[in-house]
Amino acid sequence: MMRVIGLMSGTSVDGIDAVLVELWGGDRDLQVTVLNFCTVPYPDALRQRILEVCGAKSLTLAELAALDEAIAEAFAHAAQRVQRGYPRADLIGSHGQTVFHRPPVGDRLGYSLQLGRGDWIAWRTGMTTIANFRAQDIALGGQGAPLVPRVDWCLLGHATEVRCVQNIGGIGNVTYLPAQLEDPEGKGVMGWDTGPGNMLLDLAVTELSGSELTYDPDGTWARQGKISEPLVEHWLQDPFFHQPPPKSTGREYFGLPFWQRCRTDATGLAPADLLATLTEFTARSIVESYRQFLPQWPQRIFLCGGGAHNSFLRERLQVHLGDLPVETTAAAGIAVDAKEAIAFAILAYWHELGLPGNLPQVTGARQAVPLGQRWLGQR
């Protein structure tokens, strides 16, 4: 048994999800017990700095170093907070904060930058830390994303049921899980980024509310609006949605520039109508991605990430998915908000065991390898 802390902050830049888990077994026989979970919000000033950098604001190398360390300090604090009152963890798996992601193009390797240096976290906490999970996959020609499908296969795969796991963070990504009796090695597991998750909605709400809100709780504001179907169809013509997997994306593509385009296209729409239309666009982008690229229609879909709390978005997904059961991962015993942090605890654990964390058919990497770099803590 190993006690591991998982740390995650996604493209929504809401804060740091921290989980403390006990792990047994390897991959297919993996067992997880969650001991504690918390979300530690970023201080407002730090969140704003991160969003500015993600929005392509220039900064000096000294400013970059300072931001890297400030994020690492926040992650270290989250690790210390989640294990308070529990025996000392053996290991930390820290995803860090993505501030730039560029998929590979042609012969050029991809590039993905996560701030929140692992050496700082190891020094601050005294615990061995695994971080920089995406680099090894990228070095082997992969996208460096998504990295969660192997974890999904182990935790949420089913003997006879074909399933999809849809994460709705800032960006949406899906894992396709074939029935394990028919595919015991998981060779048919697929995964890719479906497009925007909460990102466009959050940008819209922030601007439309004059920064009084940073998101639309439960989709309440959007629910009051009327959907513009022509705009949804227009936005769905973007080339990303027709690009076959493996594929990944980020704030560079579906962040501020895309939002500005949507806002211009929606000139004259009332705020609630624009939010309703963006919600429909997000739901349709997910469902159309399934229709284009899934080898088989699933029998059940599990939602996770912040978007799983948006009941209006869930309703729009259900409208387009018909009678297909759509649940959250909580129905399978995995808390919606903790799932991604659990995944990076597991990837760190697999690193220690020498087990691969990526799936080449998902990321496009040449082979499966253990993920992350290791910084030794003080015993």
Curated annotation (Swiss-Prot):
GO terms for biological process: 1,6-anhydro-N-acetyl-beta-muramic acid catabolic process; amino sugar metabolic process; peptidoglycan turnover. It catalyses: 1,6-anhydro-N-acetyl-beta-muramate + ATP + H2O = N-acetyl-D-muramate 6-phosphate + ADP + H(+). InterPro entries: Anhydro_N_Ac-Mur_kinase, ATPase_NBD. Keywords: ATP-binding, Carbohydrate metabolism, Kinase, Nucleotide-binding, Transferase. Gene3D superfamilies: 3.30.420.40. ATP binds at residues 10-17. It holds the Pfam family AnmK. SUPFAM superfamilies: Actin-like ATPase domain. PANTHER family: ANHYDRO-N-ACETYLMURAMIC ACID KINASE (PTHR30605:SF0). Belongs to the anhydro-N-acetylmuramic acid kinase family. Catalyzes the specific phosphorylation of 1,6-anhydro-N-acetylmuramic acid (anhMurNAc) with the simultaneous cleavage of the 1,6-anhydro ring, generating MurNAc-6-P. Is required for the utilization of anhMurNAc either imported from the medium or derived from its own cell wall murein, and thus plays a role in cell wall recycling. This is Anhydro-N-acetylmuramic acid kinase. It comes from Thermosynechococcus vestitus (strain NIES-2133 / IAM M-273 / BP-1).
